[in-house]
Amino acid sequence: MKTLYSLRRFYHVETLFNGTLALAGRDQETTGFAWWAGNARLINLSGKLLGAHVAHAGLIVFWAGAMNLFEVAHFVPEKPMYEQGLILLPHLATLGWGVGPGGEVIDTFPYFVSGVLHLISSAVLGFGGIYHALLGPETLEESFPFFGYVWKDRNKMTTILGIHLILLGIGAFLLVLKALYFGGVYDTWAPGGGDVRKITNLTLSPSVIFGYSLKSPFGGEGWIVSVDDLEDIIGGHVWLGSICILGGIWHILTKPFAWARRAFVWSGEAYLSYSLGALSVFGFIACCFVWFNNTAYPSEFYGPTGPEASQAQAFTFLVRDQRLGANVGSAQGPTGLGKYLMRSPTGEVIFGGETMRFWDLRAPWLEPLRGPNGLDLSRLKKDIQPWQERRSAEYMTHAPLGSLNSVGGVATEINAVNYVSPRSWLATSHFVLGFFLFVGHLWHAGRARAAAAGFEKGIDRDFEPVLSMTPLN
C-alpha cells in the first residue's frame, strides 16, 4: 500500500474496486475509498471537501435561479398559480412579492429579479467550488487553521455547529424583518379574501408559541401544523431565531460535557448520519405542513388543501340548493343524517355528507359564516358573499388529488381540471425525500457505530469478480 496521507486521520474501511482509475491523493489506495464512493475520498482532505460542498451549493442555487426564470417565462397572470404547475413562484408570492388583494399577481418583475440574483450567486459559488476542488489547498489545517478541522476534535465540531446555528437564526430573522419592515407578507386571512400586510402585533407569549409543540398531532389538534395566524408564525420565528443564535453562541464558547462525549460517536460519518436524520424529520414535517396548512401555504397560490376542497364542494351545493328553495337546515340525506348540515361529535354545526370527516377545517372563505356553535344558519341564509361562492367553486374543482398523467381533481367531479396541485407535488416529494434521508441516516449511523466499535472492514472482497478483470484504462 502507498504511503497514507496521514495515519492519524485514515478511515479504516475497505472498499476495493479499481485503484488505477483516480487522481493521486484521491485514489483507493490513499483514501480507502474507490472513485464511485464520491466524496468519501475527501473525508480527510478538508480543502477538497470544501470545494465539493461549495460546488454543490452552486448547483442548488443554479437550479433555483433557472427554475425561477422558467416559471416566470411560462407564467400566465390570468390563471391561478396552482393551475400552472408552479412550485417556486408561490413561495415568492407568499412572501408578499408581486401580489395584491385576493392573491392576484400585479407585478412579475420581483420574480424575475429573484431568478437573476440566484443565477448570479450560483456563478460565484460555482467558481468557488471549482477553485477549491481543483486549485485550492488540499487541506486547510496548515494554511487556514480557523477553517481547518479534525473530525474527532469535539471542541472544533461544536464550534462549527454553533456557527451553523447562528446562520440559521439569522435566516429566521430575515423572515421576521420582511414581515415587519420590508413590505410585509401575504396574509390569506386578511378581510375580504387575503392581502399583503405588515405584521404589527407579534405573538411572543411562550405559552402560545410552545403550546403548539405540546399539542397532539392528531385530529383537530394538529401539533405545529395547526398554526393559523401570521402573528404566531412570525412570532415563532422570533423565538426560533433567538434560540438558534443563543444556542450557537453557547456551542462556540463551550466544550461538550462528559455525558455528550460518551453518548455520541465523533466521526465524519457519524455527523453525516445525524444531519441526514434531522433532514429526514424536516422532510416529514414539511410534507404535513404543505398538505394541511393553508396559512403558511395560502390556498390562493398552492391550491386548496384536501379537506378545503371537500368542504368547498359541500358549501357550493348548499348555496345552489338553497337558491333553488331547499331548507338546508332540515333537509335529510340518504343516511338519515343532515344532507347539508349536521352536528359534530362535540355539538358544533358542520357540513353534512362525506365531508363531515373534514369538519375541523378552517379556511378564510368559510370562517365568517361560523358562530359560537359552528356554522351559523342565519349567516348561511343571509350573509354569504359572492367572493366566498366564487372561491369555493374554484377550490371544489381543484382538489389536490392527481395522477402522474395530470388528470387531476376528484375522479367523479365532472368540472375538474387537468392539473396536479403544487400541494400534491410538494407533499409527496418531501415525503419521499424524507424517507430516503431516513434510510441514509440508518445506513451511515450503522457504519459510523461499527467503525467506532472497531469491527467495520467493509465487505470481504477476496473473491470479487472485478479483481480478476482487466483495469479499465
Swiss-Prot record:
Give the propeptide positions: 1-14
Q: Name one GO biological process term.
A: photosynthetic electron transport in photosystem II
Identify residues that carry N-acetylthreonine.
T15
The chain residues annotated with the modification Phosphothreonine are T15
Keywords associated with the record: Acetylation, Chlorophyll, Chloroplast, Chromophore, Manganese, Membrane, Metal-binding, Phosphoprotein, Photosynthesis, Photosystem II, Plastid, Thylakoid, Transmembrane, Transmembrane helix
Q: Which Pfam families match?
A: PSII
Listed under subunit, the entry gives:
PSII is composed of 1 copy each of membrane proteins PsbA, PsbB, PsbC, PsbD, PsbE, PsbF, PsbH, PsbI, PsbJ, PsbK, PsbL, PsbM, PsbT, PsbX, PsbY, PsbZ, Psb30/Ycf12, at least 3 peripheral proteins of the oxygen-evolving complex and a large number of cofactors. It forms dimeric complexes.
Know the name of this protein? Photosystem II CP43 reaction center protein
Q: Which organism is it from?
A: Chloranthus spicatus
